Structures are given as C-alpha cells and as structure tokens.
C-alpha cells in the first residue's frame, strides 16, 4: 500500500471542548484515557488526520467554527489534526446513551444475566434505526474526505463504527478497509440474545472489511463462531481465520497493544492528595479501573478481606482507584454504589481507613499509584485488553506482583508472568493476594523483571505497524479471492443498516 492515503476514524475523540469563561469561545482540552487516546496516538504515529464525533454542544460549536479540523498536541508530544462530525443531537443522544453505551456494550461484555435482563422493546428498534443514521454520518464524512484519493486506505476503530465498513465498501469496492474492535466479542450463544435484525445487521456491517482486528485470539474465535451460527451462507476457515461471504473475503487478526512509550515518558506522575501519607509505612495493594462493572473492584475488595482474615496482611492497605466513566448508565452508577458498600464493610471489619477509594480522571494520579503499589490487581470480569496491565509493571518501582484475570485480553500475552485468577472466585483471588505479599524480595524482583520483558515489546508503534502490515497482506489475498466471485450476483448491504 505504498503511496496510499490513510483515513482514520473512531467515534471517540481524544479532545473535547468547554467554554472559556474569559472569551466565551470553545476551549479544547485532552480527554483522559480510553480508546480515543489510543486512536489519537495512532494518528500521531502515522501523521494523518482523524475523524471523530462531536460529543457535546461545545464540541459541535467548535466543529462549526473549525470545519477543516483542529490541531492538538498529545501527551506524547505528537500533533494530530482532528475533524469532528456534527450528528443530529437526538440521534447522537440515543446512540450514545442507549445503543452503544448500554445495549452494545452489555452485549459484548456479558452485561446481562439473562434471567431478569434484557427485555427488548421498541426502544431497541428505535436505537438501531438511529445507529444506522449515525453510521451513515461517519461513512459520508470518511468518503467525502477521501473523494479525491485514488488509492485510499481506511482504518476504522471500535464497536461504535461496526456498520461503517459495509457503507465504505459500496462506494470504494477495491479499497483496503480495517475494522479494529477494542472490546471483547462474546460467545455465539450470548450474541444471539440481541434482536435478530441487530445481531445479523452488525455482522453484515462488519464483514465487508478486509481485516477485522481484536486484541485477543479468543475474541477472534468468538466472532467466527457468531458468523457460523447466524450466517448460513458464510464459509468459515477457522485455521486461516477467514470468512468468505457474498463476494467478500475477510481475515480475522489478533493484534495486541500494550502501551505508548512516548505517552508514559511524557507523564508527570503525582499521587492523589493524601495517599502518600496514608500509605506511608504500609504495603499498598492497588486496584485500578473505570467505573464500569467489568472492572470488578467489589470482588477485589472482598477478596482482600478474605486474605486479611487468614493473617499476614498486617501493615497493608488497599487503594481502589476508580476513573469516573459513563455514570449516566445505570449499571455503572450501581457498580460505584456496590464498591462503596464493599469498602465500608471492609473498613468495619479490618479497621477504619484500611481500604480507600480514590475517584478522579487524572492519568498522572493513576500512573503514580502504579509506581507506588506493592501489589496490583486487574481482575476484570471480561476486558478487551486492559492496557494498564502493561503500563503498571513498566512504571512500578517496588517490584509489585500482578494479579490478572484470566478473562482479560491481556492474559494471552502476560498471563504466564502474572498470578492468573478466575475473576469470580474470591477464594482464589484471596490466596493470590496472600501469596503475592508473602513472596521474598528476590522472587519478587525476578518475577517483575520477567513481566517487564514480556510487556515491553507491545508498543503502540508495533501495534500500528501490525495493522498496516496485516491489512496489506489481507488486501492482496482479498483481491485474488475476488476474482473467483466475478460471476456472483452483487448483494448490497445498504438495507442492513
């Protein structure tokens, strides 16, 4: 794909706007963490522009004032040009608050118990219709940006844009298209929970991509099984990780990402106020994650209490570091309440202020907590990858052990170098906490060195290159395969969205 022009898109931007009180004009600032920042750094590596959604009224106003985009400097020092799409506010609100943050997130992350939820009413159909309009906005913006390009390459990121590849393929049938999904893909049986038009429509939107990427092998396998289960006219090759469907050939690829070296180097870590004094003279156990049920802090706290009952945790404190995220989603707000309850009960049993919650979105605070920790817990119930599991061992200064969920995407890379646990088993997690804190200095140092060596190769730059190399190879294979379908009737996927 030498000489090709690359076009990058994701729903979430790394920048957002508020109003400058002095001037009344929109003021840009870098949003913390998340997929948006990962994609932004990718744009910086490739030195290309990036299309994303305007999330707020201030974002929309800034977009109207800057139709050609805004240049921002990232934490790594790289500069990017971002152009924000202005969606119909009602459409965007429904897609943001219901369709993606609630319905699609729950479907991909096993958020429903199936006994009591979900029940799909007319709101699901309305959300799906708005999702189609939202998807069309993105496809139109990408196609407009690439209209003058003879040889465009499209990099489309995350689950909110799963319908975009089909619409791009209709207009640019020969273009290389990569869709990278940053979250898990559930089992085929779980995917069947969704209404028929949604569960198949999403697959129809994705399969025209040349390459579909996930962070872990298990998500690729689950996706292939969903296709095999729901699309009887698809030909699945599980060894080659390919799908042939209605003239399309799609390759599934696992492309792990760990961290951005420049971003880590560009941080200024500082512990949150009061934490240094509180932790002084104590071993510190740190659990870190968003205010999202998948991050599983409640069970981590309860496992810590179990471990303490067994002895050996004297002079040990636990910090639950939570980053506020999507608290308008009922499941997230309920999760925060459950964590607070677990912490209160832990302190009632173990002594006041043994366990603390620290709740903000300052990444420098998070990095500083990683550095100070004597034990790190990442026990997600499920996770597409979890970059913190790579970042924390690399910045830690105390040879902290790591407890890592076996259902986290990162476990495929780091599992053998961490204490791998079933995230639902409190006893196993308690035993892992006790064993980690009982380990001697030499054992800890040797394990930490092996863990750092395992994490270090998985840089942002390597991940970006893996996308480009994989897409180039898959585009060549797809082109060869397409010749076999020259006589097949054309099938439009427009109606699927």
From Swiss-Prot:
Pfam families: Glyco_transf_20. Its EC number is 2.5.1.135. It catalyses: validamine 7-phosphate + GDP-valienol = validoxylamine A 7'-phosphate + GDP + H(+). Validamine 7-phosphate binds at residues 182, 383-386. SUPFAM superfamilies: UDP-Glycosyltransferase/glycogen phosphorylase. One of its GO terms (biological process) is antibiotic biosynthetic process. One of its GO terms (molecular function) is alpha,alpha-trehalose-phosphate synthase (UDP-forming) activity. Gene3D superfamilies: Glycogen Phosphorylase B (3.40.50.2000). InterPro entries: Glyco_trans_20. Keywords: Antibiotic biosynthesis, Transferase. GDP-valienol binds at residues 158, 290, 295, 321, 325-326, 361-362, 366, 387-388, 391. Involved in the biosynthesis of the antifungal agent validamycin A. Catalyzes the condensation between GDP-valienol and validamine 7-phosphate via a nonglycosidic C-N bond formation to yield validoxylamine A 7'-phosphate. Homodimer. Belongs to the glycosyltransferase 20 family. This is Validamine 7-phosphate valienyltransferase. It comes from Streptomyces hygroscopicus subsp. limoneus. The lineage of its organism: Bacteria, Bacillati, Actinomycetota, Actinomycetes, Kitasatosporales.
